[in-house]
Structure formats: structure tokens, C-alpha cells
Amino acid sequence: TESIRLSRAAGQTFLTLKATASLGHIQEMQGLLHQAVETHRDALQLGDRSGKRPVPFAGMAYVGIAMLLYEWNDLEAALHYAREGIGLSEMGGRVSYVLAGRTVLALVHQARGEVGRAFETVREVEELAQRHGHPYVMAEMAEIRIRLWVAQGNLATASQWALDCDGSVVDEGIPPLAHEMQQIAMVRVLIARTLSSASDEPSRAGLPNADEMDDALGLLVGLLGGAEASGRVRSVIKILALQALAFQAQGDQGQAMSALGRALSLAEPEGYVRTFIDEGEPMAGLLRRALAQGIAPGYVAGLLAALEEGSASGPTVEQPMAEPLTERELEVLRLVAAGLSNQEIARELVIALSTVKSHINHVYGKMGVKSRTQAVARAQSLGML
């Protein structure tokens, strides 16, 4: 704030704008999203030439607002601000903000299920980042790639990435935040592999993947300590959410809910949305369990609603079902809505895991859905729950 005051007093518009936008970025990292957006708006006013087109240096403020709007799940507004910020930053030769703006574009494409456009944008960002030497952006793009591959069920490619970069994950030569992002990408691979093994090959769930979850949780403990020590609350929330997913994959629901509860308590005052819903169906299961336990019920219900709204590939809810569910299928569906895993449903109903999977597949087929979140949303719209 002192640099803002001094540069403003000296009439240095560019320095004032840069210092103000930098303050907004710091506030965002501290988890103060509402303060950050107000700071970026102040920067926009500084960059405004009496109602004419803003000066190129205002691009950094536009991109900052775009990132916050994305977190709040206002995708259309995020696109608008990102594109404006990219255009201004290109005019001003500010490559770092061009990269940040295009990162928002990649995230929005991913959120909308536009996989091809997301991959293409990631490729463009990677090329530019490599050309100009931005290791953090390269690590950020790797994480987005991992999320896209996992969403596609392409664990082979994600696992190959993990093998290829295993040495660099512990490379102390890269900047700390890039190192953190790489480790987060690695954790995502380990969680996805474990969840896949638990659902497809239950007899192997406790063998190599148990060790992988120990590795993932070990990485997350280190990351959490670093983020807490430096006051980066936004990273703390993200890491806690991943911790919850890792504990869930390990079968430790108590620890999973504890980590999720901490994340929600930090996130609720600032209205975080995408940090949670970008994790997809595994997070939806945890959120349903949190709602059932009365943890931040209003906030969690809103997150679940955002998740269900984002299931664009689901059917129109007004369409009636052509074939009704059996009593057993309804029973399974209610347990799914309560957040129980396949294994927990099997124990609850005293049936084989394969039978649970068969019932769930029948439910999906009859309801015309592809995921638990879509099934629960459809059932709620039809008054079945």
C-alpha cells in the first residue's frame, strides 16, 4: 500500500496501476477474494482514460478479476474479463498476464466440458510459457491436463506423465509455487489411480494403491505446512480439499470429513465454488455426506446445486422415466444420495460389490445419466428422494 501511495503522489499511473494489481493478487493468494476484486476494480479505474478504452497496463486488473469470477463460477463474466485482459496485455507486451488470461480460458473450457478447446488452449499456453520461461505456468498447465485426462478416464496417459516427471517433482531448482503445482498434479494422479482401482479391482485396493495414498498424503502434509506458514489461504483450501479426497480414496471417511470441514470453514466467507466443484463426482460424494452431517448446510447445498447444474450432459429433468426403478434400485439410489461409496452400500445392504455396481448401472440406464451427481439431481427433480 505504501508503494501505491508513493506512485500515486508522483503521478506515475503505470506504477500505481501495477502496484494496485499486485496488491489484488496478494489478497487473492491470502484468500481475501472480495478484497481482491475491489482492489482490481480500483486498478481498472486508474487505467481508465476518461471513459475511453483502458490503457494496456489495465490488462493485469482485468485478468485478476477474471480469475476471481471463475472461482465464483460466473463463467460468462470470467470469459469477458479474460478476453479483455488478454487483448490489453498483448497491446502492452505483458506476456505473464496474457498467459494468466489464457489460463482462465482453459479453465472455463474445462468447466463447460469443452475438452477439445481446453486441450488446444493448454497447448497454446504451454508453447508461449516455454518460449518466455514461465515454469509456474507450465506446471499449472500440467495440472489442467491431468484433470482433463482423469475426467476422460485416461489414467494411462496421466500415469505416464507422473512417471516422466517423477524426478522433477523433487527438483529444488524450480520456483516454490511451480514445485507446489507439480506436486498437486502428482497427487491428482495418485488419487485417480486409487479410486479407479477401488471401483474396478476391489481386491487390489489395499496393495500398491495403499502405498500411493500414503505418498499422496505425505506430499499434501508438506504442501499444507508451506501454504499455512506463508499465509496462502487459497492454497490451504485447495490442499485441504485434496486431502479430503485422498483420505476418502484411502477409506478413512472420518479424516476426509475433518479435512473437508476445515476447507469449507475457510472457503465459505469468501464464497469459493470452483475449488470444490472442479473436483467432480468424488467431491460431490463428500459434499453430500457433509450435508447429511449438517456441515455448513447452506453453503454445501449451494455447491451441490452448482455441481448438478454443471452436469450438462444429463437429461432434461422434466422428461419422465420410461421404466421405473425397482425397490432395490431405489434403495441403492437413496444411499448414493447420502454419499455412501459402493463398498459402503454393499455393507449396508449386505450384498456383493458387483451387485451394487450392477444396480447402479441399471439406475444410470433407466435415468439416462452418466454419474452419481446427475442421478441424484434427476431423482430430486422427479421427487424420488
Please give the residue ranges for each predicted region.
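Transmembrane helices and adjacent periplasmic/lumenal helix-loop junctions
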Residues: 13
